[in-house]
Structure formats: structure tokens, C-alpha cells
């Protein structure tokens, strides 16, 4: 399979995930601020999940941009990632509809954790296919974000059963560290061209 088809399939699945999430947002019953305020947990859950899907899409784009080959293992690892991301609409809706209750918040964290582990597997297979001395391997470096995020998700899962606000803070913090643009791959590829 060519890289273009690989990217197009992934982009399509991610677009569908976002579409499903937005369709879960319900129109408030009533025309008052009080009616709208009842929807805030669902809306906040949607915003956080939208950010996560956007982060994965952006990083997926950069990772594949640095890839010259697509292997069968990479295809399966990518499907694994897309599977966990496809659970975001369910876990997002469940958490929001239940106002960040402990179990839905923990299950949301499990989906985040499994997506992070799936990302690590995909990234590892892509680096292996490119070679340990590749531009991609050098660009990724120690990957502190990739190591810190699962720890924050684990902390959030545990915190869900004690103080759900701490769980949400852990999930938000993980998203925020990824929102800071990471131009390592772009810089490494630009440097390689010169």
C-alpha cells in the first residue's frame, strides 16, 4: 500500500470520529441560558476530545511525512490506533452525559491511555522501518511528551475514583503539553534537505 492511501484512510476515519462526536451534541430544550448550561459537561467533553483527535491527526501527518515506506506491521498498528480513537465518541458522550462521574471519567482515561500506547507502537514500527539512524529517530529524540502522557492518563484514571476534577485536570494537562507546537520532525526534515 502506498503512503498516500495510508494517510487518506486515516484522515477519513479521524474525520468520521469528529463528525460522530459533534452529532452527539444535543440542542438544549428551551431558549434560556439555564437550558444551555445543562449541556456544559457534554460540550466540555466534546472540546477536550476534539483537541485530542486534532493532536493525533497533526502528529500522524508529521510522522507519515517523515516515512518513506509502509509495512504490514505499520498498517496493523495504525488500525490499532484508529480503533482506540474510534472509542472517543462513546467515552466522550458517556463522560459528558454523566457530568464527569467516576466510572465514565476512568473509562475515558483508559481510551486515552490505550490510544497513547497504540501511538507508541505505531511510532516504534515506523522508526524501525526508517532505521535507527534515520532523520525521524533523531527528530523524536527522548520523546518526553510520549512518556509523560501515559503517566498523566494513569493518574487521571486513578483520580477518577477519588476526585474527578483531578482526573479532568490530568487529561487536560496532557492535551496542553501536546498543543504546544512540536516542530522537531519539520526541522529535521528541512535540515536534511539542506
Give a label for each model feature:
Residues 1-194:
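Multi-pass alpha-helical transmembrane bundle typical of ion/small-solute transporters
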Amino acid at each position: 500500500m502506498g503512503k498516500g492511501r495510508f494517510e487518506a484512510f486515516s484522515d477519513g476515519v479521524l474525520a468520521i470520529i469528529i463528525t460522530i462526536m459533534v452529532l452527539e451534541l444535543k440542542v438544549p430544550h428551551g431558549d434560556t441560558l439555564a437550558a444551555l448550561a445543562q449541556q456544559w459537561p457534554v460540550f466540555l467533553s466534546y472540546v477536550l476530545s476534539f483537541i485530542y483527535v486534532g493532536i493525533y491527526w497533526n502528529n500522524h501527518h508529521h510522522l507519515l511525512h517523515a516515512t518513506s515506506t509502509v509495512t504490514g506491521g505499520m498498517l496493523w498498528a495504525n488500525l490499532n490506533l484508529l480503533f482506540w480513537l474510534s472509542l472517543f465518541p462513546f467515552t466522550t458522550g458517556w463522560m459528558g452525559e454523566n457530568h464527569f462521574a467516576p466510572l465514565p471519567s476512568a473509562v475515558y482515561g483508559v481510551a486515552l491511555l490505550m490510544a497513547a500506547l497504540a501511538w507508541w507502537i505505531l511510532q516504534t514500527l515506523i522508526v524501525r522501518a526508517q532505521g535507527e539512524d534515520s532523520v525521524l529517530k533523531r527528530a523524536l529524540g527522548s520523546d518526553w511528551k510520549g512518556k509523560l502522557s501515559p503517566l498523566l492518563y494513569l493518574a487521571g484514571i486513578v483520580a477518577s475514583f477519588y476526585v474527578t476534577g483531578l482526573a479532568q485536570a490530568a487529561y487536560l494537562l496532557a492535551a496542553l503539553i501536546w498543543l504546544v507546537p512540536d516542530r522537531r520532525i519539520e526541522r529535521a526534515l528541512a535540515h536534511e534537505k539542506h
